[in-house]
C-alpha cells in the first residue's frame, strides 16, 4: 500500500515539499488506528413506542429490546418492530402490568409481567407466546401481582415472588412449583450469589437463602436484618460483594464471606437506585443508575464513589 502511495505521489508536478507532505499525511491516515465510540439517540420520532422505558436487553444477535409503557420494541440498528402480548385471546394492557425483560441460557427473550403472565419470544414465528399463566397454574391464593422475579440463566429457571410466597418456574419443562419457605413477607428484589444461594430483599430486611429440592432454607446473617427501605440489591461475583441500595441511608457493601457490612460514605442518601450493573472497564467496579441523579461508579475494593 505504501508503494502505491509513493508511485501516486511521483506523478504529481515536481514539487518536492508538496510530495513529502502528501506522503506523510496519507501514511499517517493508513497506519493510525481509528478509535471511535458511536452513540445514537433513540426516541419516539424514529420508532420507539414510548419514552418511558421499563427494561432493556441485548440479544445474541446484537438486537436491542425495549419494554416500554406501550409494549415491546425490537431495534435492529435500522428499524423497530413492535410486539403485542395476548393472553387467552385478549390483548393485554401494557401498563402497569408489564415488569421486565430477561434472556435465558439459549439467548431467548422473556417478558415477565406483574400479572403472572410469562411470555417467550418465538423467533420462527416472530412473536411472543404465553408459556405460563400464573393464576391458572396456581389455584391457591397466589397473592398476585408478582412483587419480584429473577431469571437464573445458569440453572434455567425463574424465581418468582408474590406478597408472601415464593415460586420456581422451570424454563425447560414449564413446571411451576410453590417453594416451601419460612419467608412470609413481601419480597421486592432478588440477587443470586454462588451455586443455589439467593438473596431476597424486603423493604427492611435481606434474607440469605439456599434453594434445596423445592425448599428455600434461610441462612442467618444478622448483619442484614435492619435497613431503611431497600431499593435495590446486586451481587458482584468477582469481589463476592452484595451491593445494597437503600433510600434513606444510601449504599452498603456486604462481604458474604467475612460478613462485614460496609457503609459507603456519601453513598447516595435519599436517592432511589434504579439499577446496578458490572463495569466492563474494571472488574472491581459497578455502575449505579439512579432516579434523577445520574450514574455513579463504585469501586468495591476502595469503596470510592464517583460520578460516571
Regions found by a protein language model. Give the residues of each.
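Carboxylate-rich, polar loop motifs that coordinate divalent cations or form catalytic acidic clusters
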Residues: 1-308
Amino acid at each position: 500500500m505504501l508503494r502505491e502511495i509513493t508511485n501516486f505521489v511521483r506523478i504529481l508536478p515536481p514539487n518536492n515539499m508538496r510530495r513529502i507532505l502528501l506522503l506523510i499525511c496519507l501514511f499517517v491516515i493508513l497506519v493510525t488506528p481509528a478509535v471511535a465510540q458511536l452513540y445514537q439517540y433513540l426516541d419516539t420520532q424514529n420508532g420507539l413506542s414510548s419514552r418511558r422505558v421499563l427494561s432493556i436487553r441485548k440479544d445474541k444477535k446484537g438486537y436491542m429490546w425495549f419494554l416500554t409503557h406501550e409494549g415491546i420494541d425490537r431495534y435492529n440498528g435500522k428499524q423497530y418492530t413492535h410486539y403485542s402480548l395476548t393472553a387467552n385471546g385478549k390483548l393485554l394492557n401494557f401498563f402497569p402490568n408489564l415488569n421486565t425483560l430477561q434472556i435465558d441460557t439459549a439467548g431467548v427473550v422473556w417478558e415477565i409481567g406483574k400479572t403472572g403472565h410469562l411470555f417467550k419470544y418465538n423467533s420462527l414465528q416472530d412473536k411472543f407466546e404465553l408459556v405460563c399463566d400464573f393464576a391458572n397454574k396456581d389455584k391457591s391464593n397466589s397473592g398476585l401481582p408478582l412483587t419480584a422475579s429473577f431469571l437464573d440463566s445458569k440453572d434455567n429457571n425463574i424465581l418468582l415472588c408474590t406478597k408472601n410466597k415464593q415460586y420456581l418456574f422451570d424454563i425447560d419443562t414449564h413446571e411451576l412449583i410453590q417453594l416451601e419457605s419460612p419467608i412470609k413477607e413481601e419480597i421486592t428484589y432478588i440477587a443470586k450469589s454462588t451455586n443455589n444461594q439467593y438473596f431476597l430483599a424486603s423493604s427492611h430486611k435481606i434474607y440469605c437463602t439456599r434453594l434445596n429440592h423445592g425448599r428455600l432454607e434461610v441462612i442467618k446473617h444478622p448483619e442484614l436484618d435492619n435497613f431503611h427501605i431497600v431499593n435495590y440489591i446486586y451481587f458482584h461475583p468477582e469481589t463476592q460483594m452484595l451491593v445494597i441500595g437503600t433510600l434513606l441511608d444510601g449504599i452498603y457493601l456486604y462481604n458474604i464471606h467475612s460478613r462485614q457490612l460496609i457503609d459507603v460514605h456519601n453513598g447516595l442518601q435519599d436517592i432511589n437506585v434504579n439499577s446496578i450493573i458490572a463495569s466492563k472497564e474494571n472488574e472491581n467496579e459497578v455502575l449505579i443508575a439512579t432516579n434523577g441523579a445520574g450514574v455513579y461508579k463504585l469501586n468495591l475494593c476502595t469503596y470510592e464513589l464517583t460520578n460516571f
